[in-house]
């Protein structure tokens, strides 16, 4: 992804969709979305001229997001446990 705030918002929307589909509570979905947008924006601001890779990883017990500019720095990783609604 290019360092565009619209891509940060899109990454947040994708995480929210995955979190809702996994049955996570609404407040957790919203927080994960906001955290993803913040992390994406932070990564974009740190390396504005570099393309970024955003990975969405779905496991049975958690969802993860990794944002990486692939310039030797460590990726920003976010993870939330899947807590199904009852």
Question: Where would I find each of the regions flagged by the language model?
Answer:
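Helix-loop-beta hinge of the Bergerat
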Residues: 1-25
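A generic structural micro-environment signature
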Residues: 5-7, 30, 84
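Residues in flexible loops and secondary-structure boundaries
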Residues: 7-9, 32, 64
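Residue-level signal for functionally critical sites in structured catalytic/ligand-binding pockets
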Residues: 12, 25-31, 67-69
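Glycine-rich loops and low-complexity Gly/Arg-rich segments
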Residues: 22-27, 78-81
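Conserved ATP-binding N-box helix of the HATPase_c
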Residues: 26-51
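Conserved beta-strand-loop-beta-strand hairpin that lines the nucleotide-binding pocket
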Residues: 42-86
